[in-house]
Amino acid sequence: LKFQIVIHIAAFNGLLLGLSWTEIGFPPLIFVAFIPLLLVEKYISDSGPNTSWNLFGCSFLTFFSSRSYTSWKVFGYSFITFLIFNITTTYWVWHASPAGSFAAFVINALLMSFAFVLFHKVKKVLGDKRGYFALIFFWISMEYLHLHWELAWPWLTLGNVFATVPDIVQWYEYTGVLGGSLWVLILNILL
C-alpha cells in the first residue's frame, strides 16, 4: 500500500472511532472501528523485517533501533488514528483550556498508540493469537491506569461508548466499564 493510502486509512479509522461516540454518534460502529487499524498493523507486520529478537532482552533500546522501523510505522499510523479520535470526541475541552486540550489530545493519543505498538511487538514475537490477547491485555491495562492516576481521563474508555444506550449494558454492574472495553476489543478482533 502507498503511504498516502495508509495515512487515509488511519485518518478514516480515527473518524470511525469518533463517529461511534457521544450523542451524535452511532455506538454499534465501535464493533468494527478498530478493524482498519488492525489491517494496517497486519500489512506493516507482514511486509517489514522480522524483529522478533527485539522484544526480550533490550526491548526499550531495540524499539528505537533502525531494525525495528515497523514499530515506528505502527506508532505513526496509530497515533494519527488516536489523535483524530481524541479530537473528535473531546473537542469541547478546547473551550475550557486550549493548551490543556492540546496536551490531553496528544498525551491520550500517545498512551493509546503505545499500547498498540506493544501489541505489535508481542504479535511479531509470539504470533497472531497471543498477539491479539496481548492487545486486549495492554489496552485494558492502559485504560485501568488511565482511570486510576492523577491525570485520569475516563471519557475515552471504550466501554463508555454505550453511555447513550445504557439498556444494552446493564451487565456493567458486574464488570464495570472495562468489561465493555473487553467486549469491544474482542468483537473487533473476531470480525
Locate predicted features.
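Membrane-embedded alpha-helical bundles of multi-pass enzymes
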Residues: 1-191
